[in-house]
Amino acid sequence: MKKDIHPKYTTVTVTCANCGNSFETRSTKESIKVDICSNCHPFYTGKQVLVDTAGRVERFKKRFAKKNASSSASE
């Protein structure tokens, strides 16, 4: 490897803007600020709210069934 061409790889503190949690990692940046971390993300905390897509799926199936029924009736 060539000398003096690589950036400094140091220990930095990652800070969450949402909950204020901070932890250390290594990076070429001086500090890292994230919007959401694993400490406050709904997927990791178990507070995940599922969006009700069942209505949309049922509506699609109903339209698809209507289209198939009309095309099979015309054949």
From Swiss-Prot:
UniProt-recorded Gene Ontology molecular function terms: rRNA binding; structural constituent of ribosome
InterPro entries xrefs: Ribosomal_bL28/bL31-like_sf, Ribosomal_bL31, Ribosomal_bL31_A, Ribosomal_bL31_sf
Protein's name in the database: Large ribosomal subunit protein bL31
Role this protein plays: Binds the 23S rRNA.
Keyword Ribosomal protein attributed: yes
Superkingdom classification of source: Bacteria
Subunit structure: Part of the 50S ribosomal subunit.
Gene Ontology annotations for the cellular component aspect, listed alphabetically: ribonucleoprotein complex; ribosome
Family: Belongs to the bacterial ribosomal protein bL31 family. Type A subfamily.
UniProt GO BP: translation
Keyword tags: Ribonucleoprotein, Ribosomal protein, RNA-binding, rRNA-binding
